[in-house]
């Protein structure tokens, strides 16, 4: 009850006091192409042009300015660098909200156009901003190509990592992205800017390590859309296609889209699991793995903006996947002291079908200088997983795992400027989650250790937070504190398991201090504490059969893992430096051990492990040389982690080195060529060692009016092989893969008057990531 009162109190406190003599002017600022202009200056001056009061436009181009209404009220002046100012006499009457259009100064010079190289990246406090629109980055082609050209960002398929920080939560036009396939509909020429937040404040959930915000190009009213298709030829063909439309009319915006994909790959693998004992035991499994995934997605959204002060809307999205893994020619061998004492051919097939329905409703309101943002997310989903394993002599095992889940999350986010250099951000979250699963199996001519099971997880999460932002001279500071209460209950059947159920009361502080001595340099130091909560699929004790000598098990007693991070980000002109030091407590990993009294069956089980430290440091540099833009990045890192292997401490501390060499040639007629070379050195992740990896990409892209084409050749000269080795207890578990990483990729997209001017979707809960 105390927790609920605390959260409610923080939500209702909103200092909204207005002077009786003040009135407000509201409006939206556009450029002469119909794009909204953010951070434009809007000021009131008196008749002698003396400053009275002022503000800047929001990322949506809107402003709300309290003004002093007197007999001679002066003027309202709107300005932005590179654009002609707009002046309105406040003595006249006018209709609100104002629609102010600022003209680019270049349009006033007749046919003389001066084109310069715009800075690609800018550091501001703990944020790296990539200016994409009207720069060479707009010709990167696919979103993956673009993201891998942003300092310290890597990844693909809509999932991206920040060097030294880990996986980033991605937002598209302020809407959190839960399905990476959504990002495959976007090309670089549709993106306005990208922000990389390297030290998120307390307004973000405690399990968020980094944030990437992607903003698309804005346009005025009308109907527009985008359609795309792509094919990939590796060992097999894959295809991806979709379309989206948006209609803006005055105060209304309607959006919709549909997407479909079919990805197919083929990989050759060999697993070698050794039990180091007397006698020495070895299990090998050689396979040809065929992967086939089908994806279908549909979405619809409506936004209504009755005034510049408030917006209401909802978005709903349904996604369905079907994952099929097929191993038709598994060759299984067992050796005792080098003697092959068991051999069989096997078949392994798995099918995973998750379906999700996510609906987001949001409402934003400005009261005086205070902005209130309310969102509610409802997630309903099911998942069916089936596994069939067969050997010679009619040995068969089949398992079925079905899950149903529900989540409802309400988030309130409030921003109040206290002075021109001090602001307060505060709010809270209340989330209810339920995850129920059943597990059953059949076996023929073999006895396993599995059992039928039914279990359920329920969680109530309450959070309250506050962030104080202030600027003193060339210094700026963001200090925040987040309180989270989580009550988690675990049931077997309908019986609550008290030993596994538990409550958490946690405080998560954050701090970021930045120094900005001039326009070309910036340094930022920060601290943040984060938590890793186990996925609901891990929070059970079900034993699942993988093969005759290999089982996998969850763990209902998993605890939260906490990390304290010290982060640094600095820049000087086109040179950037990033660093971090993490103190990790009770991390979650898949530990290997023998199953029960068995001497040769290996169990891989989720568990909390001992504390350790991670460190990372990276440097990035880029520069324009005419049509050529090189981009160089190098990163170093490691961990201080030890674990028992063969009854002695084994140190997994070998440092790693990564580097990127990216080359872009910007040619005439909207034609560009890019050549990427990436290297990821041998590295450790806890007690798992992964060998080095090379990636290359040669891409050609071209815009022809509303059409965009990209042709890429990937990893042609790179080795396919990669090895992963886990050393734990008396077990050496190695996996060798011959990957399907060499391919040719073709993308074709068409945009017709594409518009999306409001970007109001505000899905915020991070609990969805646990399902």
Where are these regions (language model features)?
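Short, acidic, small-residue-rich periplasmic hinge/interaction motif at the N-terminus
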Residues: 30, 43-45, 79-83, 95-136, ...
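N-terminal periplasmic accessory domains that precede
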Residues: 97-101, 111, 143-146, 180-181, ...
